[in-house]
């Protein structure tokens, strides 16, 4: 018996967002300038005018958010002596997944005497979302680096708490090929993760800030002086590494803590303008 066209038809595959963005910065005549730029798919990079010696790059995901099966790859190289600030146009939204992870991979190379600020705005995890994110940084001789990753579990204004969101966030930082710092953050949608006193303790927002440079101990003293007694945060410095971890009940409270910390620790000494919009 001949099958009808309707019986033969199989479900069309869901469209997925894929993108790649690459940028290379070079020091020329005392200022950091664009050397190379490549963008493909949903990844776009914009270079707003800056008035300091650093170059600012804004990463844009034109798909408007990520869900299961989406993939984005970013790569940035700061050549010798250059200063590069990388941020995002807005908060990245991770929507409910049907089973697959959304994947975001970032690779940064910081040349001799160069500095990179990796300052993306917050990532918002929606209920049922799944995100697998990785950050690899290769530092060469005398290179310095500052990074922040902030996560919001749902949107406070909408009464969301994203209790079943899944996150795996992997950081690997190398100095001249040797591993100097590693982070492995995981959320598996378990109740104890949200309420455990040694974990989130009921908070809906958290952030990690990392600064690598020769003045880590000095900056730790300055950082502790700007963290109020009511802030749920811990900071430490070992060798050239300074790490700050913060939890907060809301995204607004989190920003109030991390914005002055980022301004203190960043190579540019200030936040990208998009953080103020």
Swiss-Prot record:
Subcellular location, record wording: Cytoplasm
InterPro entries, alphabetized: UreD
Disordered, as annotated region: 1-20
Keywords of this entry: Chaperone, Cytoplasm, Nickel insertion
Domain of life: Bacteria
Family the entry assigns: Belongs to the UreD family.
HAMAP family: UreD
Protein name: Urease accessory protein UreD
Organism from which the protein derives: Chelativorans sp. (strain BNC1)
